[in-house]
Amino acid sequence: GSLGTFFHDMCDFFGMEEYFIRMYTDPQVVHAATDRLVDFYVEANDRFFREAGDSFDIFLIVNDLLTQRDLFMSLEQFRTFILPGFKRLIEVGKKYGKTIMLHSCGSIYRVIPDLIDAGVDILHPIQAMAAHMDAETLAREFGRDLAFCGGVDTQDKLVNWSPAQIREEVLRLRDVFGGNLIVSASHEEILPNIPIENMIAMARAAKE
């Protein structure tokens, strides 16, 4: 299962700035539009899960809500307009026994407790250079409740470090996160500016 990108859709529909303004000026309109979008994603994924059965394990929910410093919005806005949609999507995934992976680039640190309470099992992509998203902080504060996918920095380290340094970084991350890490780049894809040798070094270190 995949996506449920209702936040992105709302930004496209209203325009991002207008969307955030309407959270204050026309909250009932924002709620109504969000509910219709989430209705669609809940129904679409419910049908997909019903037909697909046990052919896959993970429901990936994708919504980029963040900068490298914090949320695009206030915590109150997140809990009022975004979190209820997440909970509905998570509920349909759990109904079919799926593991819930949430994707959101940037510093999602401030709302991780809300996501854990909502039922998120895996956090992706662990943007390593974003505020409070270092491995030590995440493992210490949330390692008992979450698995992590990502963490190998694609903004600097994978681009500029040597393969030997990348190997050491992967081994360090594995040590910090223990068994709760799926080794991956810190974004959802590996960009062309990353040397192939470093990609190979990351993959090999993950298998050691």
PLM regions and their residue ranges:
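Active-site loop segments of alpha/beta catalytic cores
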Residues: 1-208
